[in-house]
Amino acid sequence: MSFSIAAFLVVLVVAISVACGLFANMITLRLSTKKLGSAERQFGENLATQIEEEGVVMTKNDNKTLPLDKDKHSKVNVFGWAATQWIMGGSGSGRSVNSSQGYTPDVDFLKALSDYDIEYNQKLISMYKSFQGSRPFWYDTLNTHDYESCRLFEPSIDDKSRYTDELLNEAKQFSDVAIVVLGRAAGESNDAPTVQYKNYANKGKVPAANIDKTRTFLDISTEEEALLSYVGNTYDKVIVVINSTNTMNLGFMDKIDGLDSCLIVGGTGNKAAGALPRVIYGEVSPSGRTVDTYAYDFSTAATYANSGMPGVGTYNNTTNLYPATGNNPNVGGSDNKYPGVSYLDYTENIYIGYMWYETADAEGFWTSDFAKNKWGVNGYQDVVQYPFGYGLSYTQFKTDVVDVSPKAGSELTKNSKITVKVSVYNDGPVAGQHVVQLYFAPEYHRDGGLEKPSIMLAAFAKTPVAVEPGKAQELTLEFDVSDMATYDCYGKKIDGGAYVLEAGKYQVRIMDDAHNLTAVRSGSATIDYRIGSDIVYDVDPTSGKEVKNRFTGEKLTDGFAVDGTTSGEGIKYMTRADFETSFPAERAANRDMAAELKAKVLYTKADAQDWADRHSDAEMPVMGSGGDLRPFDGKKATDLGLELGADYFDPRWEQVLDQIKSSELDALVLHGYVQENTIASIGKDKTSSVDGPSQIGSFNQIPGTGFPMPTVLAQSFNTELARSFGLAVGAEAQAMGYSGWYAPGINMHRSPFGGRNYEYYSEDPMLTGLIAAGVSKGSLQTGTYLYAKHMIGYDQESYRDGLYCWMTEQTLRDVYLKPFKLAIDKGGLTGVMTAYGRIGAVWSGGSEALLTDLLRDEWGFNGAVLTDYADHHNFMNGDQMIRAGGDLWMDGLMSKGSFKQEKTSAAFRQAERNAAHHVLYMILNAAYIHSNYDPSADGITISSSDIDGGWWLPVLIVGDILIVGGAATLVVFGILRKDKKKAAAAEASESAEANKDEETPDAEA
């Protein structure tokens, strides 16, 4: 028995030790109890409130309903079940949690009202809570289906068991103010559904009776519509609060009588809902602007038919190819099989968001027979409710144009910069901030010209503080003429691809939003320029390197064109030359996959060999030279490290890289999940990175500040506020022992239904890129590097693993890559994270055309490239990544990644050496920037520390020793006991023999 127990204990120790070894990094992070200091916490919470204050968008305010008078309206009725389940943000890696790791904010809207000394109708709220206690499953979109995580709950206003006559009559007596809360939440792995699942709380599929197929998740439900109609007809003042992670259809605000005001507040994070009463009662004037176009009908978007789950196509002949060969871990857990190999056609071309709606208006599309017949509209006013950049205030501003350079009427040159100085004068009754937006409208050449929107955001600025009544502030807006160029991928103007500024007329416009000119008091809101002849940008103005097609044509590094022309996709892309016949009204029928595409579904030994053949001239690098250069002292940069961080091309880098051992290179590259591994040969300890565009450490024991969702930050239109956000999160990261941050999320709001839209900024590449640049600047000043995500084509969640994303190279560059380029060039960004899907036919994390040809050879990017979490190692694999130009493989929670192809060639070892250079430069560059930053200028405290969750390791070791020692004791005890038994048995046997000998003679006698 002792031996059995001992064997069990030894097996247990081995099993626990192996498991802890595999999960050591995550266990340490999860168990960390490192708390923010009071200074960091206070700075973060104050900033979160400011972000919410500046990000709230007021879209309607009839009869100056807002602001409310606190003396007259100290009591309010809060209607809508969503008020009891206030949304902090979306689900997934960008989530926010409260101080106890829960999903209900420490300060929700109701608590915010109470804290502001506003009394709300408790009986009304109690009724909602008794109707449905919580929003089930929404916080776990990674493990649920959309029909579980995206459900709507609202009692019918006609249900007298809920809305009793007594309850409604008392509510009218309680207050003449009704605030109606509408809530929507989506998240990672599930796009918002195009149907409604209602009033069903059980896990699993929703009964047909609880599904409304006539409305989408982002429309109001019939129950919400009836409630809004009731309060609109009953109450003197009605304010609608939109607490949503996604752009809702707000057409009801125009159609239902009595709805006075509307505030878009987004997900407010853990405590920033406290800002809302300050806005509602006029302590703060709204200054946010919409970052998406609000249309009356989602289907008027050119992306509608080819987005979300309904927009995904499935190749007919791919049932035995990845990922159809396994389960989909990203949509509803392990019970959901992939139907086949999926693809997504970006048939809308470059025309997303306002770039579609405004261009369609310029072309008369909204008054065409097509539009009239399909949607029953007759003009822009029937299609767009709130344009991009729209927002109201409690005050009025008058704009004076102070100076323009170059002067109106000038001919622009290749390297010109356009500068517009304006003065904004507060002509209203209260203080407030104001946003000025600058757009350009290029001339479009229908015959043979490049695709281009009718209008594009070029620059924006916001008054840094509230302007007092009767006072003015001056703002300067500027942009490079090269920002107006569009990419020519089909050789219309130049063979081989380049950015081109076509000859013609260009008008710069000062605008209130993407549709309406600003009524300036002096000067002109429009500035006309001209380009005499085509200007070609075939050299990148920042890097000085060649610009050319990387994804279009026949001879391509990745083997396939991103637009599908070389693989027989037959995609018809929309063109401005003929919107009516090219508008993608419905998704095309599923098609077959070409044989040559089938052969490249997964990375193979032959692919690795082909790469090696193309790099056969590589020389074997020196490894493990044993030198004594130390750019690191543990996690900290030495003086040498700071000097190397200042210059990627410092010749001493070669000596440092020579010292790194091959085993250290392997460990660094292979195991990049939330860490940059130890490199003892140069003095570097393991550094840790953390996820969370809204909140660092949201998956750990003690999280950082839960900020409003990133979209709210973008709604502020304030790049300096974005820098402050980067400062705050970077400082928190340092205080909690982290060196890197998985942020910002800078994919596009291609569709309102994108599950992770809340993590991303907007539908506009310029706004997205400039906000991201601000965040990057601030974070780097604290010494915290960032991995901006997700590069590229990750604009929806449905079937994200291995999704083939087909688009033109112009679309790729002008829309989706532009935010990354801006963040790198203007924000100093030194880290990017790749995506789950494919850019065309090739996984983005393994695309040599993307990571080497474009990112490094064209853009001159010297930082690190990290993959996203590798669910399937046979697809998102380290072999393909390192050869394509990636650096860190996020091989997963168990850190079990390994190379499957050869790793002894000179080319391979050189690729690993390059990866180390990129990663180390990223880390040291952040340290260098921090060393030249004075935090006192921003009133912030930055104190670095180590993660303290590693206490469990010595405890485990001691426990192992005690258990093994106990097992050994049992074995020894068992042996001794066995020996004792044997001795006793032997003694008994001898005694028996003696007795036998004595008895024998008597027997014989």
Give the role of each language-model region.
Residues 516-547:
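Short beta-strand elements
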